[in-house]
């Protein structure tokens, strides 16, 4: 649970701000072992270009290099064509597997926008 957003919250760069141009892109694995309770995930997506949409979701795995599956409740709203979107979702880390990644699927052409996902989390022993 996020008790103190000031001094007790840590930022998780699930997907650092990066160009989302074609296909499906996946972020690096984030280890949730040191965190507990709700994690707020914030999506910041800029307009991607005419007809371009971004479908962003969180995926999870028991091992860093394992097979990743969708996190229950971990999908953001798909952006409208050529529209920016900022959105926040909450997922409880106790309900997720140890490792998470972000997945961005670009549809409708070659994107020209940037997409980032940041998590705000509380450590177990802080």
Annotate the PLM regions.
Residues 1-13, 106-126:
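C-terminal interaction-tip segments
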Residues 17, 74, 92-94:
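Compositionally biased, intrinsically disordered low-complexity segments
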Residues 17-34, 46-70, 77-85, 105-112:
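Surface-exposed ligand/attachment interfaces on beta-rich extracellular proteins
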Residues 37-43, 93-111:
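Noncatalytic modules at the cell exterior or secretory-pathway interfaces
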Residues 81-98:
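Aromatic- and Gly/Pro-enriched, solvent-exposed loop/edge beta-strand patches characteristic
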